[in-house]
Amino acid sequence: MFHRIEEALEDLKQGKVIIVCDDKNRENEGDFLALAEYITPETINFMITHGRGLVCVPLPEHYAKRLQLEPMVSQNTDSHHTAFTVSIDHISTTTGISAHERATTVRELLNPSSKGSDFNRPGHIFPLIAKDGGVLRRAGHTEAAVDLAKLCGTEPVGVICEIIKEDGTMARVPDLIQVAKQFDIKMITIEDLIAYRRHHETFVTKEVEITLPTEFGTFHAIGYTNSLDQKEHIALIKGDVSTDEPVLVRVHSECLTGDVFGSCRCDCGPQLHAALTQIEREGRGVLLYMRQEGRGIGLLNKLRAYKLQEEGLDTVEANEKLGFPADLRDYGIGAQILKDLGLQKLRLLTNNPRKIAGLQGYELEIVERVPLQMPTKQENKTYLQTKVTKLGHLLNL
């Protein structure tokens, strides 16, 4: 049904059109997408004939500034905040509406010598300003077009057109599948593009290294930042972990209430202390402390979830009541830090199969799962039972 991002990139590099939709939900809509660098009148004509939507040109903000493309409106009230600029035609065109003249306008947007005065306003091409960070910041077709152009190594500008059915209604995923088959077009999702970028790009930066004496032992501490959400993480390292021998690793998500205040609602604090103790005892290992409070929902939302648990919900139901998944954590940043430290083979201290799968997806080999089970307390018995029954944690209760 859907194609791999690599397949779509190959077609785009050949000047072909692809279809991009938000995700695999059958109610989502789709756009035709092509690279502006390879645009032709034939491609424009295909889009307006079979797509029937508005032909838009997603581009980075610095292109818009260079060409003096001001926002279409001073106050954007669009529900998706699509960043339309004023519409344009190149001054060499006549009416600007034909496929040939629209292709000319697109090509002239890429001309490095073009300036704002080279375009008439309004016109028949609709530039869109993509957010910096692309689909990792805004999961829209605008950002997808610019990201795909960058991944293809061309000018970071795309051409998109919404796909509308012959009866005038929006084409949904089942309709898009038929269109893709009819014209032998690759179809991808923005969801998969996000995953592709997370997997293939590096977002972590090593910022500072210190020696950190603790009550558990002395560790080499390295602080990291990441460009996705600007959160700061820290790795505590014991011994030489750059060899080929498997390394004992604990990826620990921040829990202020458990780690610092000793909350009995969870087993986070005891797990943290036990992991540091075990790493110190073995003389070699890594504890990666990730700022993912409350399984990724943040401190205040975790407290709100606790409040709902006091009213009878379990930890998963509380998250869902607040509008969050049961577990919002993404292990990609943690995996990149571990790879930056030179790790390849891990003996992972965890009870969570999802954590194993999350790290293995980033080419880290988990050679052994090392259980990290703490004594059950009356206050956290229900919490731990829910982790077993609903989150699949491997605990003997």
UniProtKB/Swiss-Prot annotation:
EC number: 4.1.99.12, 3.5.4.25
Binding-site list for GTP: R250, V251, H252, S253, E254, Q271, E293, G294, R295, T315, T350, K355
Keywords assigned by UniProt, alphabetized: GTP-binding, Hydrolase, Lyase, Magnesium, Manganese, Metal-binding, Multifunctional enzyme, Nucleotide-binding, Riboflavin biosynthesis, Zinc
GO biological-process terms attached to the record: riboflavin biosynthetic process
Residues holding D-ribulose 5-phosphate: R26, E27, D31, R138, A139, G140, H141, T142, E162
Cellular component, GO, one term: cytosol
Co-factor requirement: Mg(2+); Mn(2+); Zn(2+)
Annotated positions binding Zn(2+): C255, C266, C268
Site (Essential for DHBP synthase activity): H124, E162
Any one Pfam family match given in the protein's UniProt record, by short name: GTP_cyclohydro2
Annotated binding of Mg(2+) 1, by residue: E27
Active site: D327, R329
Record bears the keyword Cell cycle: no
Metabolic or biological pathway, per its Swiss-Prot or TrEMBL entry: Cofactor biosynthesis; riboflavin biosynthesis; 2-hydroxy-3-oxobutyl phosphate from D-ribulose 5-phosphate: step 1/1; Cofactor biosynthesis; riboflavin biosynthesis; 5-amino-6-(D-ribitylamino)uracil from GTP: step 1/4
InterPro entries linked to this entry: DHBP_synth_RibB-like_a/b_dom, DHBP_synthase_RibB, GTP_cyclohydro_II, RibA, RibA-like_sf, Riboflavin_synth_RibBA
Protein name listed in UniProt: Riboflavin biosynthesis protein RibBA
